[in-house]
Amino acid sequence: MTASVLLHSHWIDPVMFLYENGLDERNKNMEGFTGSNFPANQCRNLLAHPTSLAPNTTYTSNDVPISGIGEPGKQCSPCPATQSSPNASLPYGYFGSSYYPCRVSHGSVKACAQPSGYGDKYMDSPVSGEEFSSRAKEYAFYQGYSSAPYQPSYLDVPVVPALSAPSETRHEPLLPMEPYQPWTITNGWSGQVYCTKEQPQSNPLWKSSLQGNSGVRRGRKKRVPYTKVQLKELEREYAANKFITKDKRRRISAQTNLTERQVTIWFQNRRVKEKKVVNKFKSPS
């Protein structure tokens, strides 16, 4: 990136600086000129303000070029650290960028800061409350994305001239946030995702299919013991033959008032019971 810098009056031609990506090359080019009164920090400040400077090394922040804004004539207050501190940071702008870093606090806005990606750290500079009130009328802060390196615990917001009159006061928040909207649950909940014991639940699909027939029970049926007459008839048929035929099953079902399935299951259980009794007597223990 190239930037033209106008020095003292005896310097006629502008001096061009070419900055490479390496840190050593930038530090070498940022040194003060031999035979002049410009220290290294003033060379950095000149790059931030490409406008003409007075012969004495003091300057004021004039029209700062901002991309996309068609209202010239806005002036910003100079940073006091550029004249008092030898390690002063850049007053405004990242070498011609349209975004300006400002540290935002509850009480007042502190001085402008330079990102550490250019070799310097943030330096604090006091700013009076009157200066902040006048500056707040000229500039409005909007949240955006800056091309500068990210600095933890600092808030970088772009500064653009206010479109309204200087006397008007902007009541917008510095960082607008979307209001919280709770989830919309269509199941009758009260806006929050939680379950309570008293919450009414809709009937499942499998339960709705059984509502028409109230006689159908879910799960295992209740055990109904056989009567003595039924057991006597079953034992008599079992003594005659341990295995039941189809015709015999129908006849026993008609006599005992039991279903054919019940008769078949009883004969199966009776054979298993007899087998257990026989095995128990056969075992020596």
Curated annotation (Swiss-Prot):
Keywords: Developmental protein, DNA-binding, Homeobox, Nucleus, Transcription, Transcription regulation. GO terms for cellular component: nucleus. CDD domains: homeodomain. Residues 219-278 bind DNA. Pfam families: Homeodomain, HoxA13_N. It is found in: Nucleus. This is Homeobox protein Hox-A13b. It comes from Takifugu rubripes. The gene is hoxa13b.
